[in-house]
A protein has these predicted regions:
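Amphipathic alpha-helical coiled-coil
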Residues: 1-432
Length: 432
């Protein structure tokens, strides 16, 4: 499992985890696992708890699509070690994971589409290549030619993941995934969900919103808290400020600027001794200071060894993915991916998790000067208006998924735009 995790830095340079961190998490999972008298049962409970615990700890660090990739890699390693007969051969697994250059195959004879107008020529070429590398599908071209109508219906089926493969019995989900890669790549995500659900459990498919309280609970004074800013991500500063107030902590926000490095370093050193929180914003903008940032983190570790580090201190930072971010800070820190949601419901829930909607007072109708305050509860119209604005924002965000069809001029419509709109609506209502 650790090697699956360590391979994720090929996907994103910010996905780095140390073996020291992994061992600590692993031991916590073993202690939390259900007890059993039989050794076989105890091992099964430990394996299940380790998988679940590790996934819960690392999932906040991954973008949503990378989280799916990580879960699939966990499935592959699980089946490889279990020796499952339903899993793929090395050749089949290589075919699944490899991008195929079809230009090299164009000159080969016998790859012509046998008069199937609904099947693209590239898809047919991939099917022939699959038949050459898979024992399960070694007669695939012949079976398609003998069952043209059934394969035509299968190809156009809207629920192709649940539909049996024509001419085959008992095809595993993994083999079906290879087949869908050839003819219906749009169904790969759906069948990946089915495989994850059946192999390691549906809990590995849940996309939880970023929860500061949970991540904070995993930390101590020597643990950097890193907000990784995804494309079109919102600024987490206001959310962190609200959380710091809730924890009754003084949050010092620093912006890394050239010429003010010494001021930043002194502020962090002072906060480490008095127990304040420090947020260093946009670390990716000052590459030349990153080596000093790593040295500063080592100073914090030295303070901890000498028992001079305040237990309430926390070092927070925001950064876009960058190869020069200090490796030691990444490996020892808790990473939290800040990304825009991909579904309407998630977009709305994300909005309710940010300011000013987190503030209960915001939901009371704004009162203009000289106007008598309304009793609490008589704010239905105001609440509906605010909710409608949130839904409008979610619609505008998701229209961007349709590229030029959605918006002629692309714009991210981030959470900051919604926040300013909500505050403006509040202001206009007061002055109306």
């Amino acid at each position: 499992l650790y090697f699956v995790l360590s391979d994720m830095d090929w996907v994103n340079c910010m996905y780095r985890f140390s073996i020291k961190w992994f061992n600590k998490v692993f031991l916590s999972a073993v202690r939390a696992a259900k007890r059993a008298r039989e050794v076989v049962d105890r091992v099964r409970f430990i394996n299940r708890e380790v998988n679940s615990y590790i996934f819960r700890r690392v999932s906040p660090a991954f973008a949503s699509y990378d989280r799916l990739s990580f879960a699939m890699c966990m499935c592959i390693r699980t089946l490889e070690h279990s020796g499952s007969g339903d899993f793929l051969s090395n050749a089949e697994l290589g075919f699944l994971l490899t991008h195929h250059d079809l230009s090299e195959m164009s000159e080969r004879e016998g790859l012509e589409n046998p008069g199937l107008p609904w099947l693209h020529a590239e898809h047919w070429t991939l099917l022939v290549m699959l038949s050459e590398q898979s024992e399960v599908f070694n007669e695939l071209p012949q079976i398609i030619s003998e069952n043209v109508e059934k394969w035509h219906n299968f190809y156009h089926c809207s629920s192709i993941v649940e539909t049996p493969v024509p001419g085959y019995k008992g095809v595993s989900e993994w083999h079906k995934m290879i087949l869908l890669k050839c003819i219906r790549p749009d169904s790969i995500i759906n069948i990946s969900h089915a495989i994850i659900r059946d192999t390691i459990g549906s809990e590995f498919l849940k996309r939880e919103r970023l929860k500061l309280n949970r991540c904070y609970g995993y930390s101590d004074a020597t643990t950097p808290m890193i907000f990784v800013l995804h494309e079109s991500a919102y600024d987490p500063t206001e959310t962190l400020r609200k959380y710091a107030n809730k924890k009754d902590k003084n949050l010092i926000v620093l912006s890394v600027q050239k010429g003010r490095e010494e001021v930043t370093e002194k502020t962090i050193r002072d906060a480490a001794k008095c127990g304040d929180w420090v947020l260093v914003e946009n670390c990716h903008l000052l590459q030349s200071w990153m080596h000093r940032f790593e040295e500063l983190f080592e100073e914090i570790l030295t303070l901890a060894k000498n028992e001079a580090l305040h237990s309430g201190f926390r070092l927070w930072c925001t950064s876009e993915p960058c190869a020069y971010f200090p490796v030691q800070v990444l490996q020892e820190g808790i990473k939290m991916m800040v990304e825009s949601p991909t579904e309407f419901r998630e977009t709305v829930l994300e909005a309710f998790d940010t300011m000013p909607l987190q503030d209960q007072d915001y939901w009371e109708r704004p009162v203009a000067e000289g106007e008598e305050a309304q009793p609490k509860g008589e704010t239905t119209v105001w609440k509906r208006t605010a909710f409608a604005l949130v839904c409008l924002h979610a619609n505008m965000v998701l229209r961007g998924d349709y590229s030029g069809i959605g918006w002629n001029c692309p714009y991210s419509f981030g959470i900051e735009d919604l926040r300013l709109s909500l505050l403006s609506m509040n202001l206009f209502t007061k002055s109306a």
